[in-house]
């Protein structure tokens, strides 16, 4: 009887975790605009991605962070939905979020990126995709 009760509790806990997105899935961060870490990750992803694009002459920069979702694995995956635009900074310069501002009258794109951060703090951009302007 005790083993059956323990099994019911275990299965109930797993069901709650799955239903709330805690167990392996992404969970949306409601207060993402109040957390500067997410904006820093967005700038990291955008500048890293744009620097790797062939034929590109200027960094892209973040206009707005629209949505943040996190997934805990062996570290944390951050799935960020962003508005980006080409910046005034050439790729031959060093990217700085405070000085690399969006060019005037350029199209903004909505992009989704995933930044993976290990338990040691190492991070990399695992994907970066944009919809047409």
From Swiss-Prot:
The keyword Plastid does not apply. One of its GO terms (cellular component) is extracellular space. It holds the Pfam family Cystatin. InterPro entries: Cystatin_dom, Cystatin_sf, Prot_inh_cystat_CS. Its main location: secreted. The keyword Transmembrane does not apply. Residues 1-19 form the signal peptide. Salivary gland. SMART domains: CY (SM00043). Keywords: Protease inhibitor, Secreted, Signal, Thiol protease inhibitor. Gene3D superfamilies: 3.10.450.10. CDD domains: CY. It is found in: Secreted. Induction: Blood feeding does not affect expression levels. GO terms for molecular function: cysteine-type endopeptidase inhibitor activity. Residues 29-115 form the Cystatin domain. Belongs to the cystatin family. Inhibitor of cysteine proteinases. Inhibits host cathepsin L (CTSL) and S (CTSS). Modulates production of various cytokines and chemokines in lipopolysaccharide (LPS)-stimulated mouse dendritic cell. Suppresses maturation of mouse bone-marrow-derived dendritic cells (BMDCs). This is Salivary cystatin-L. It comes from Ixodes persulcatus (Taiga tick).
């Amino acid at each position: 009887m005790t083993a059956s009760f323990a099994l019911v509790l275990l299965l109930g806990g797993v069901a709650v975790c799955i239903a709330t997105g805690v167990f392996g899935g992404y969970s949306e961060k409601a207060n993402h605009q109040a957390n500067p870490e997410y904006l820093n990750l967005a700038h990291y992803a955008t500048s890293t991605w744009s620097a790797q694009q062939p034929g590109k002459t200027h960094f892209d920069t973040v206009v707005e962070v629209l949505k943040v979702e996190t997934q805990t694995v062996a570290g944390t995956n951050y799935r960020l939905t962003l508005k980006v635009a080409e910046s005034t900074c050439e790729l031959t310069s060093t990217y700085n979020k405070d000085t690399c501002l969006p060019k005037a009258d350029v199209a903004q794109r909505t992009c989704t990126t995933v930044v993976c951060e290990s338990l040691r703090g190492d991070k990399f951009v695992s994907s970066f995709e944009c919809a047409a302007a």
